[in-house]
C-alpha cells in the first residue's frame, strides 16, 4: 500500500545513531585521561624553569639543526601558559598513566642563563629525556643533575657550559646517551663514567677536556658511538677501548695522544669509522686493523706514523675514505689500494713514499674521486692508467720527480669529471701554458706553481680553443717574464696568482675586463705601473666591482697610489707594501670604508697624515716604514673591528693613545720608532697580545697596577686551543706579519700565531720601578724593557712568567739581586741583564748557564757558579775584584803621598825664588812669554 508505515525504517537509523553516540562518548571517556593528565606540581616546576632563563630574540639569519634539518630557532617556552595542560605544551612529553613529565626538549630554544643547584628542573624526578642542545646556557652543571636517576638521554651540546663533569653523573645508571659536545667543559673524564653500563652513545667533542682517557671507558660494553675529538687529551690511547665489541664509530682526532694505536683495536670488528688524525701518534699502524673489514673511513693524517702501507690493505674491502697525509710513511704506494671498489677518497700526501707509480690493473671503472698523493718522493712519469679513473674530480701529484721528462697532459683529456688538478713543483721540462690549456675542457682549478712555465704571447698551437672553464689558476714561482696573454679569454677566471715571477712592465688593463676576477696576486715581480686609463682597455672604462683581494707587494710601482683602486667597491684586502709609492693616502679611498678589512701600505714613501674619515671597517692597518707625520687620528676609536694597528718607523708626533683601549678586539699595537712622547696613561687592553712602543720618547713611571687588566696576556691559555696552530688573518687569503725584537735580534713574523705574546717598551725614558703586576702576564713570551732608566729591584713576580722565552732589561739602573725565581723559568732561552747596578748571586737555573757572558757584564757585583761557568776566563769574581781594587787603592794612596812629599819641598823653593824675581826685577825675558801681552792675546783668541 502506498504511504504505509514501515517500522524498520525508523528503528534502524535510531539504532545506528545510538551506537555512534555511544562509541563517541566511550571514546571521550577512554581518551580523557591522556588529555588532562598535567600534574599541578609538574606544571608549576616547568613555569618556574621558564622564568629561570632569559629568552633571546633570534634574527632572520639565525638557524640551528633538528633531526639533521636546518630550522630557525624557536623560543619553545613562550607557548607555556598557566591556564593550559602542560602535557600539551611544546617540548613536553608526559607519561600517559602517571601524568608526570618524562621528556623535556628545549633544543634550539634561544635560552640564556645558567643552572642553579636548586633549579626547578631537578623536581622533575621521573624525567627520562633532557635535551637542551643549541642554546646559550653557561656555568657549571650542578651536582643535582645526579638526582634525575631515571634519565636515559642527556643532551647538552652546543652551549657554553664549563667546569668539570660532576661526579654525580655516575648516579644516572640508566643513561644510554650522553652528549656534551661543543661546550667549555674542562678537566678529566671521571673514571666513574665506566659505571654507566647502559651507555650506547658518548659525545664529548670540542671542549677543553684534558688528561688521559680513563681505562674504565672500556667497561662500556654497550657503547656503539664514542666521540672525543678537539680536546686536550694526552697520553696513550687506552687499549681497553678494544673491549668495546659493539663500537661502530670512534672519533679521537685533534688531541695530543702519543704512542701507537693499540693493537686491540683489531678486535673492533663492527667499526665503520676510525678517526685518529691530528695527534702525535707514532710507530707502525698495527696490522690488526686489517681485521676491520666493515671499515668505511680510516683517518690517520697529521701524526708521526712510520713504516709502510701494507700491500694487502685491500682486505679493507668496504673502505671509502683513507687519509694518511702528513706522516712519515715510507715504501711504495700499494697498487692494491686501487682494487678497493668503494674507495672514493685517497690522501697520502706529505709522506716519504717513493718508487715509481703504478695504479694497478683496473678492470672496471673506478669510483675514486679524490686522489691526493703529492709531496712524496715518487719518481717517473704519470701513469697513463690514470685515465681509467673516469670519476676523478681532484688529482694532486705535486713534487713528483719526473727526472726532467715532459708531462703528457693529454692523459687528462680523458678525465671528463676532473675539476681540480695540482701539479706544482715537478722536476719536468718547461710547460707551455698555451699548449696545455686546450686539454682542460671542464677543469676549474689548475696549480702548476714552481714549474718553469712558458707563457709566450702567441696563438695556441692546438686547433682546439683554450678552455674557458678555469676559475682558479696558480702560476706562482714559474719564472714568467711577460704577462700571459692567453688569460685574456678566461672569462670564468676568479682566482689568479702570478706572484714570485719576473714579470716586468705594466699590469695589463684587460685584466679588469674579466668579470669574475675576485683574487689577484701580483706580489714579488718587477711591475712598474698599472696600465694607464688612456689605453684601449683602460681602467676607467671597465667594470671592476668583483675584485675582493688585491696583492701587489714588493714590486717597482712608483708615483702616487692609483686612484682607480677607489673604484674597486667590493675590495676587502689591499696590499701595496714594499713599493715606492709616494704622496699621501688618497682621500677617495673613503669609498671603500664599508668593505675594506685589510690595508697594508708598509714600506713605501708615503707622506702626510693618516686620513681621519676612512677605513672604519678595517681589521688590520699596517702603514709602517713610511714618512707619515702628525698625530694618530682619534677617529680610530670608531674602528670597532680593528685587531692590528702598525704605524712603526714613521714621524708621528703624539702622546700615548690610551683611548685605543676601548677597541675590544685590538690584539697587536706597534708604535715603534716614531716621536711619541710623554707618560703612558693607565689603560685596559683586554685582548692585546703584542705591544711594541719601543724607540720613542715616552717617559715617567709605570703605575704599580698597570698590567692588572691586560687579560689576554694573563690567561690566554684558557681561551685558546694551543694544540693546533692558528694564525691571525682574514681566512685563507691574508695573514698578518710584523718584525719584532726577540732574543736580541730583529725577527720577522711572516705569520702571527694567535697565542704569540710580546711586550717591548725598550728605547724610551721610563723610570721608577718595574711594576710588580708584570708578573700577572703569565702567557708572555717576549719581554723587552731595555734602554730605559728603570730603577729599584727586578720584581720577583717575574718568576710567574712561566712561558717567557726572551727577557731583556739591559741598559737601565736596576739594583739588588737577580731574583732567584727566574732560575725556574725553563723556557727562558735568552736574557740580558747587562749595564745595570745589579749585585749578588746569579740564579743557578739551567737557562742561566747557557747565556753569553755579555748578558751580565757592567754590573756592580754579580757572582756565583752560573756566572763563573758562562764567563770562565773572562770573569773575575766580584768579591775578588773588590779586594783587589781596595788593595790597589791603598797602594796608590801611599805612592801618592810619597810623590807629593818628593815634589813638595823643591816646589816651595822654586816658588819663593820666582816670586822674589817677579817682585824685585821683572826681567824682560820673563815678561815677554808670560806677561801682560801674552795674556791679552789669549783672551782675544778665547773670545
From Swiss-Prot:
<feature type="repeat" description="LRR 21">
    <location>
        <begin position="619"/>
        <end position="639"/>
    </location>
</feature>
<protein>
    <recommendedName>
        <fullName>Receptor-like protein 35</fullName>
    </recommendedName>
</protein>
<keyword id="KW-0732">Signal</keyword>
<feature type="glycosylation site" description="N-linked (GlcNAc...) asparagine">
    <location>
        <position position="354"/>
    </location>
</feature>
<feature type="glycosylation site" description="N-linked (GlcNAc...) asparagine">
    <location>
        <position position="147"/>
    </location>
</feature>
<feature type="glycosylation site" description="N-linked (GlcNAc...) asparagine">
    <location>
        <position position="222"/>
    </location>
</feature>
<dbReference type="InterPro" id="IPR003591">
    <property type="entry name" value="Leu-rich_rpt_typical-subtyp"/>
</dbReference>
<keyword id="KW-0812">Transmembrane</keyword>
<feature type="topological domain" description="Cytoplasmic">
    <location>
        <begin position="919"/>
        <end position="943"/>
    </location>
</feature>
<feature type="glycosylation site" description="N-linked (GlcNAc...) asparagine">
    <location>
        <position position="784"/>
    </location>
</feature>
<feature type="repeat" description="LRR 23">
    <location>
        <begin position="667"/>
        <end position="685"/>
    </location>
</feature>
<dbReference type="Pfam" id="PF00560">
    <property type="entry name" value="LRR_1"/>
</dbReference>
<keyword id="KW-1003">Cell membrane</keyword>
<feature type="glycosylation site" description="N-linked (GlcNAc...) asparagine">
    <location>
        <position position="699"/>
    </location>
</feature>
<feature type="glycosylation site" description="N-linked (GlcNAc...) asparagine">
    <location>
        <position position="391"/>
    </location>
</feature>
<dbReference type="InterPro" id="IPR032675">
    <property type="entry name" value="LRR_dom_sf"/>
</dbReference>
<feature type="repeat" description="LRR 1">
    <location>
        <begin position="124"/>
        <end position="148"/>
    </location>
</feature>
<feature type="glycosylation site" description="N-linked (GlcNAc...) asparagine">
    <location>
        <position position="882"/>
    </location>
</feature>
<feature type="repeat" description="LRR 11">
    <location>
        <begin position="366"/>
        <end position="389"/>
    </location>
</feature>
<feature type="repeat" description="LRR 2">
    <location>
        <begin position="150"/>
        <end position="171"/>
    </location>
</feature>
<feature type="repeat" description="LRR 18">
    <location>
        <begin position="544"/>
        <end position="568"/>
    </location>
</feature>
<feature type="glycosylation site" description="N-linked (GlcNAc...) asparagine">
    <location>
        <position position="582"/>
    </location>
</feature>
<feature type="glycosylation site" description="N-linked (GlcNAc...) asparagine">
    <location>
        <position position="457"/>
    </location>
</feature>
<dbReference type="Pfam" id="PF23598">
    <property type="entry name" value="LRR_14"/>
</dbReference>
<feature type="repeat" description="LRR 3">
    <location>
        <begin position="172"/>
        <end position="196"/>
    </location>
</feature>
<dbReference type="GO" id="GO:0005886">
    <property type="term" value="C:plasma membrane"/>
</dbReference>
<feature type="repeat" description="LRR 20">
    <location>
        <begin position="593"/>
        <end position="617"/>
    </location>
</feature>
<comment type="similarity">
    <text>Belongs to the RLP family.</text>
</comment>
<dbReference type="Pfam" id="PF13855">
    <property type="entry name" value="LRR_8"/>
</dbReference>
<feature type="repeat" description="LRR 14">
    <location>
        <begin position="440"/>
        <end position="463"/>
    </location>
</feature>
<feature type="repeat" description="LRR 9">
    <location>
        <begin position="319"/>
        <end position="340"/>
    </location>
</feature>
<dbReference type="InterPro" id="IPR055414">
    <property type="entry name" value="LRR_R13L4/SHOC2-like"/>
</dbReference>
<feature type="glycosylation site" description="N-linked (GlcNAc...) asparagine">
    <location>
        <position position="361"/>
    </location>
</feature>
<dbReference type="InterPro" id="IPR001611">
    <property type="entry name" value="Leu-rich_rpt"/>
</dbReference>
<feature type="glycosylation site" description="N-linked (GlcNAc...) asparagine">
    <location>
        <position position="556"/>
    </location>
</feature>
<feature type="repeat" description="LRR 19">
    <location>
        <begin position="569"/>
        <end position="592"/>
    </location>
</feature>
<feature type="glycosylation site" description="N-linked (GlcNAc...) asparagine">
    <location>
        <position position="219"/>
    </location>
</feature>
<feature type="repeat" description="LRR 16">
    <location>
        <begin position="491"/>
        <end position="514"/>
    </location>
</feature>
<keyword id="KW-0675">Receptor</keyword>
<feature type="repeat" description="LRR 26">
    <location>
        <begin position="778"/>
        <end position="801"/>
    </location>
</feature>
<dbReference type="Pfam" id="PF08263">
    <property type="entry name" value="LRRNT_2"/>
</dbReference>
<feature type="glycosylation site" description="N-linked (GlcNAc...) asparagine">
    <location>
        <position position="524"/>
    </location>
</feature>
Amino acid at each position: 500500500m502506498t504511504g504505509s508505515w514501515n517500522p524498520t525504517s525508523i528503528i534502524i537509523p535510531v539504532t545506528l545513531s545510538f551506537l555512534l553516540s555511544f562509541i563517541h562518548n566511550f571514546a571521550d571517556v577512554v581518551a580523557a585521561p591522556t588529555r588532562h593528565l598535567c600534574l599541578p606540581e609538574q606544571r608549576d616546576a616547568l613555569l618556574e624553569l621558564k622564568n629561570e632563563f632569559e629568552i633571546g630574540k633570534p634574527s632572520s639569519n639565525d638557524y640551528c639543526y633538528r633531526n639533521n634539518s636546518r630550522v630557525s630557532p624557536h623560543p619553545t617556552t613562550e607557548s607555556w601558559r598557566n591556564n593550559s595542560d602542560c602535557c600539551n605544551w611544546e617540548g613536553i612529553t608526559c607519561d600517559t598513566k602517571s601524568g608526570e613529565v618524562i621528556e623535556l626538549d628545549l633544543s634550539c630554544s634561544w635560552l640564556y642563563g645558567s643552572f642553579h643547584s636548586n633549579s626547578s628542573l631537578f623536581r622533575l624526578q621521573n624525567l627520562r629525556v633532557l635535551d637542551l642542545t643549541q642554546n646559550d646556557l653557561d656555568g657549571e652543571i650542578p651536582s643535582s643533575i645526579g638526582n634525575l636517576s631515571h634519565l636515559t638521554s642527556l643532551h647538552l651540546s652546543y652551549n657554553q657550559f664549563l667546569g668539570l663533569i660532576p661526579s654525580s653523573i655516575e648516579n644516572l645508571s640508566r643513561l644510554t646517551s650522553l652528549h656534551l659536545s661543543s661546550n667549555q667543559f674542562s678537566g678529566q673524564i671521571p673514571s666513574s663514567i665506566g659505571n654507566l653500563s647502559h651507555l650506547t652513545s658518548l659525545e664529548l667533542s670540542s671542549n677543553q677536556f684534558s688528561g688521559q682517557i680513563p681505562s674504565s671507558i672500556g667497561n662500556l660494553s654497550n657503547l656503539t658511538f664514542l666521540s672525543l675529538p678537539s680536546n686536550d687529551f694526552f697520553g696513550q690511547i687506552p687499549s681497553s677501548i678494544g673491549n668495546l665489541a659493539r663500537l661502530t664509530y670512534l672519533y679521537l682526532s685533534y688531541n695530543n695522544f702519543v704512542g701507537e694505536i693499540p693493537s686491540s683495536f683489531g678486535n673492533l670488528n663492527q667499526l665503520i669509522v676510525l678517526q685518529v688524525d691530528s695527534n702525535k701518534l707514532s710507530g707502525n699502524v698495527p696490522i690488526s686493523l686489517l681485521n676491520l673489514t666493515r671499515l668505511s673511513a680510516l683517518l690517520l693524517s697529521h701524526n708521526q706514523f712510520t713504516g709502510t702501507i701494507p700491500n694487502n690493505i685491500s682486505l679493507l674491502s668496504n673502505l671509502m675514505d683513507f687519509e694518511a697525509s702528513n706522516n712519515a710513511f715510507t715504501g711504495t704506494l700499494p697498487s692494491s689500494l686501487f682494487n678497493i671498489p668503494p674507495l672514493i677518497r685517497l690522501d697520502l700526501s706529505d709522506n716519504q713514499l717513493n718508487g715509481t707509480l703504478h695504479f694497478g690493473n683496473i678492470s672496471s671503472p673506478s669510483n675514486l674521486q679524490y686522489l691526493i698523493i703529492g709531496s712524496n718522493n715518487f719518481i717517473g712519469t704519470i701513469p697513463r692508467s690514470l685515465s681509467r679513473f673516469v670519476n676523478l674530480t681532484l688529482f694532486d701529484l705535486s713534487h713528483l720527480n719526473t727526472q726532467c721528462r715532459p708531462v703528457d697532459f693529454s692523459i687528462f683529456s680523458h678525465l671528463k669529471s676532473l675539476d681540480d688538478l695540482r701539479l706544482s713543483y715537478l722536476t719536468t721540462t718547461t710547460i707551455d701554458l698555451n699548449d696545455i690549456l686546450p686539454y682542460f675542457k671542464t677543469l676549474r682549478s689548475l696549480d702548476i706553481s714552481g714549474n718553469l712555465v712558458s707563457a709566450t704571447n702567441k696563438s695556441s698551437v692546438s686547433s682546439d680553443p683554450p678552455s674557458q672553464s678555469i676559475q682558479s689558476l696558480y702560476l706562482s714561482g714559474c719564472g714568467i717574464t711577460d704577462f700571459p696573454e692567453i688569460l685574456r679569454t678566461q672569462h670564468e677566471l676568479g682566482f689568479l696568482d702570478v706572484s714570485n715571477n719576473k714579470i716586468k712592465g705594466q699590469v695589463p688593463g684587460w685584466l679588469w675586463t674579466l668579470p669574475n676576477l675576485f683574487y689577484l696576486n701580483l706580489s714579488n715581480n718587477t711591475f712598474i705601473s698599472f696600465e694607464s686609463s688612456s689605453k684601449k682597455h683602460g681602467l676607467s672604462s671597465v667594470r671592476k666591482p668583483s675584485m675582493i683581494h688585491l696583492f701587489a707587494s714588493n714590486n717597482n710601482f712608483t708615483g702616487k697610489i692609483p686612484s682607480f683602486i677607489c673604484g674597486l667597491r667590493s675590495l676587502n684586502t689591499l696590499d701595496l707594501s714594499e713599493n715606492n709609492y709616494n704622496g699621501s693616502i688618497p682621500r677617495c679611498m673613503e669609498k671603500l670604508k664599508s668593505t675594506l678589512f685589510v690595508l697594508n701600505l708598509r714600506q713605501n714613501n708615503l707622506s702626510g697624515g693618516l686620513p681621519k674619515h676612512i677605513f672604519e671597517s678595517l681589521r688590520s692597518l699596517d702603514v709602517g716604514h713610511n714618512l707619515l707625520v702628525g698625530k694618530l687620528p682619534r677617529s680610530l676609536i670608531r674602528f670597532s673591528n680593528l685587531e692590528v694597528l702598525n704605524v712603526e718607523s714613521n714621524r708621528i708626533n703624539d702622546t700615548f693613545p690610551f683611548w685605543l683601549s676601548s677597541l675590544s678586539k685590538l690584539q697587536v699595537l706597534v708604535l715603534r720608532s716614531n716621536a711619541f712622547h710623554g707618560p703612558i696613561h693607565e689603560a685596559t687592553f683586554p685582548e692585546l697580545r703584542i705591544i711594541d712602543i719601543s724607540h720613542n720618547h715616552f717617559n715617567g713611571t709605570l703605575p704599580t697596577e698597570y698590567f692588572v687588566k691586560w687579560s689576554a696576556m694573563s690567561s690566554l691559555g684558557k681561551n685558546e686551543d694551543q694544540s693546533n696552530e692558528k694564525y691571525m688573518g682574514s681566512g685563507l687569503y691574508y695573514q698578518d706579519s710584523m718584525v719584532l725584537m726577540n732574543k736580541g735580534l730583529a725577527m720577522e713574523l711572516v705569520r702571527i700565531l694567535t697565542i704569540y705574546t710580546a711586550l717591548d717598551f725598550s728605547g724610551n725614558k721610563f723610570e721608577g720601578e718595574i711594576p710588580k703586576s708584570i708578573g700577572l702576564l703569565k702567557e708572555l713570551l717576549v719581554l723587552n724593557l731595555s734602554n730605559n732608566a728603570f730603577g729599584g729591584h727586578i720584581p720577583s713576580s717575574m718568576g710567574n712568567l712561566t712561558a717567557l722565552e726572551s727577557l731583556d732589561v739591559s741598559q737601565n739602573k736596576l739594583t739588588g739581586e737577580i731574583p732567584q725565581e727566574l732560575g725556574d723559568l725553563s723556557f727562558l732561552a735568552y736574557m740580558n741583564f747587562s749595564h745595570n747596578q745589579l749585585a749578588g748571586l746569579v740564579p743557578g737555573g739551567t737557562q742561566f748557564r747557557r747565556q753569553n757572558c755579555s748578558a751580565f757584564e757592567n754590573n756592580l757585583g754579580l757572582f756565583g757558579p752560573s756566572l763563573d761557568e758562562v764567563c770562565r776566563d773572562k770573569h773575575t769574581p766580584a768579591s775578588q775584584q773588590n779586594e783587589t781594587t781596595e788593595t790597589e787603592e791603598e797602594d796608590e794612596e801611599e805612592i801618592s803621598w810619597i810623590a807629593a812629599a818628593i815634589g813638595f819641598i823643591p816646589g816651595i823653593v822654586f816658588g819663593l825664588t820666582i816670586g822674589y824675581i817677579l817682585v824685585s826685577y821683572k826681567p824682560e825675558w820673563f815678561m815677554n812669554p808670560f806677561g801682560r801681552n801674552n795674556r791679552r792675546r789669549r783672551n782675544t783668541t778665547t773670545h
